[in-house]
Amino acid sequence: MATDTIAGDRIRALAGRGPPGIAVCVAGPEGVRAAGADGLADIAAGVQASPWMVCPWLSVTKLVTATAAMRLAELGVLDLDAPVFEHVPALRQVRPAARAGRITARHLLSHSAGFSNPMPVRWVHLEDQLAPGPDLFLNGLLARHHRLRFEPGSRAAYSNLGPLVLAAAMTTVTGRPFAELVSEEILGPLGMGTTAFTYTPEMRRRAAVGYHPRLSPMRLLLPRWVIGKPAGPWISLRPFLLDGPAYGGLLGSLDDLARFLLLHLRDGELDGVRILSRAATASMRQITVRGRRYDLGLGWFRPASQRDADPPFVEHLGGGVGFYNLIRIYPSRGVGVAVMGNATSYHIDAVARLALAD
């Protein structure tokens, strides 16, 4: 099916006073139905935004982590319902110890393990800075945030710690570094050639600049070495990488995110490559545990405020300093939408809804 272009003026109308640059696509099982972009990927250089610009995916990465975990489960390598304690030495610091010993991969996938959610705004480094190793990073985090808030499985509470623990378990059971595992099991087979945990030369050429409101108080929390030059009402950000890949470290294009969206719209198969069974793909969208802010499935979530949405949807957001992204599926309609923008915050829900309404 031919892909329609979403006109730039329509995208700008959708975004309102949105990010400097934005890219949107709408897809169904047959493929991408429409895609487009508007604005600037780099204000200073005058580079136009496009579906091929590369942005940090931030927490949209969690859905890729979840998909990789489900694949390992189907391969018989990862037991979703067995405690992960023996696979993750850092969990020995967590209290109460009895609760920590009951945490399973299923709990980690559904954000129902009981972890708190510390602010990750400083969990970043520049490309030329030395990053902490995954074990050292996780050990340090759990030493500081070691108390579980509730019994695993009793409710959901979104946390950036869970995916890091899950990645550690995945590394142990496979004997493969997490980034390598995701590349070989998900990104490579799906042909997502401009998505990775570090910039390739081609990705660097396509990289969008992130922007944060110049007068925002949150600017005071940012590491000084991330802050770039002013650009009108914005402050630019220097290209950064995340210390914990599994919770938000992927970098990639909307074009590649559309391929990942199609994988889930096509029940786990894309271009003749099956990553997950139909049953496993559907189970990821099934809401199993409720929380105050989000209700969770095995990767996908639904805002608690949207429990009665018609039509119902599941999604994952990727928000952080400088970028804001979304991937959403309406299962009953068999359609999905993906949005990427290079600003900390904008009306992304309105963009997604109006893009689908077109």
PLM region descriptions:
Residues 36, 315-316, 324-343:
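Short, well-ordered beta-strand elements
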Residues 305, 311, 339-358:
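Short, gly/Ser/Thr-rich active-site loops of penicillin-recognizing serine hydrolases
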Residues 79-96, 188-190:
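Short, glycine/proline-biased beta-turn/loop segments that scaffold the active-site neighborhood
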Residues 6-11, 24, 30, 54-81, ...:
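Active-site SXXK
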Residues 32, 96-319:
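Short, surface-exposed loop or secondary-structure junction motifs
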Residues 2-57, 77, 144-146:
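Short, conserved catalytic-motif segment at the N-terminal edge
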Residues 45-47, 325-326, 347-353:
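A short, polar/proline- and glycine-enriched secondary-structure boundary/capping micro-motif
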Residues 40-42, 83-92, 122-127:
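Short linear capping/connector segments at secondary-structure termini
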